[in-house]
């Protein structure tokens, strides 16, 4: 639904994907069995190349947290009915792919072979995170470290990143560092800060000053201006350590059915203050 100038809405930061024609290898099975090799020259800050686009039924943002795992938002990889309403069911992995590069003209495209999610967060909020298991390792690509053993802290400065675009953005879709701020509220599954978020930023990393991923962009109050800070909601990672462990096991070749239960939304968050800041 289009936003009028100055109108505010609480939206998840997704947008419809652009169409990208992908070249297919002549010997697809053989090519898919080989690891992906990153180009020799990436961006001036190579770590930024770990922030990628996630494209399924909508277009979102994700973060490489290992050579074959991408962290994003759960609501970015769920099914919708014919009315566009969220169905509490994940997309098939083959419907989702990851685009590499800093804008809407990717230099690489990688398929997904498994989607690891909690049994909540289908629309936004607590549990709004998903880990995509890629069909090949991205050898040579930089990765970010998710902070799983320390809770977000009130007063901690955070910076969101994403591939979103607001109506008044002067540039085409590209990787952007958003205006962030200090965390002012922490609950059992979320934390909040005033930040500038655009549609398409959902799933993007929320980075600490030490450049660890402390959360995932879930939802925000947005208008048409990318410089406007609004009330933003970020999903905590530390509550879902078992989800990250399961994703690593699945990436290593184990079946999800072989693993202990990992989709529970009754995780164990690390201790943190939950009162609103003064």
Regions found by a protein language model. Give the residues of each.
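Active-site-proximal beta-strand/loop segments in catalytic clefts of secreted hydrolases
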Residues: 55-57, 65-67, 73-75, 100-101, ...
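Conserved catalytic-core segment of clan PA serine endopeptidases
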Residues: 27-47, 85-139
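Active-site region of chymotrypsin-like
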Residues: 41-60, 135-143, 167-249
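Active-site substrate-binding loop(s) of clan PA
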Residues: 80-89, 113-123, 134-169
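C-terminal subregion of chymotrypsin/trypsin-like serine protease catalytic domains
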Residues: 16-27, 65, 69, 77, ...
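C-terminal motif of bacterial Sec signal peptides marking the signal peptidase cleavage site
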Residues: 11-13
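Catalytic histidine site
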Residues: 44-91
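Bacterial N-terminal signal peptides that target proteins for export
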Residues: 1-4
């Amino acid at each position: 639904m289009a936003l009028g100038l100055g109108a505010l809405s609480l939206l998840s930061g997704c947008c419809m994907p652009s169409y990208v024609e992908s070249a297919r290898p002549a010997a697809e099975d053989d090519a898919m069995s080989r690891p992906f090799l990153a180009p020799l020259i990436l961006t001036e800050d190579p770590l930024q190349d770990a922030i990628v686009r996630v494209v399924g039924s909508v277009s979102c943002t994700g973060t490489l947290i290992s050579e074959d795992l991408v962290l994003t938002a759960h609501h970015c990889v769920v099914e919708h009915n014919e009315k566009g309403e969220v169905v509490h069911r994940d997309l098939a992995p083959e419907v989702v792919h990851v685009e590499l590069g800093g804008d809407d003209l990717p230099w690489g495209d990688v398929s997904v072979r498994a989607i690891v999610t909690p049994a909540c967060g289908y629309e936004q909020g607590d549990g709004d995170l998903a880990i995509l298991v890629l069909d090949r390792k991205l050898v040579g690509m930089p990765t970010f470290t998710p902070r799983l053993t320390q809770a977000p802290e009130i007063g901690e400065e955070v910076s969101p990143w994403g591939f979103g675009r607001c109506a008044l953005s002067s540039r085409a879709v590209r990787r952007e560092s958003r205006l962030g701020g200090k965390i002012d509220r922490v609950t059992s599954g979320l934390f909040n800060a005033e930040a500038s978020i655009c549609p398409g930023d959902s799933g993007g990393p929320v980075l600490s000053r030490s450049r660890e991923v402390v959360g995932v962009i879930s939802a925000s109050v947005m208008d048409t201006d990318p410089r406007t800070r609004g009330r933003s909601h970020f999903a905590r990672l530390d509550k879902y350590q078992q989800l990250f462990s399961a994703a690593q096991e699945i990436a290593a070749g184990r079946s999800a059915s072989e693993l202990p239960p990992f989709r529970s939304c009754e995780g164990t968050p690390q201790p943190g203050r939950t009162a609103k800041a003064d």
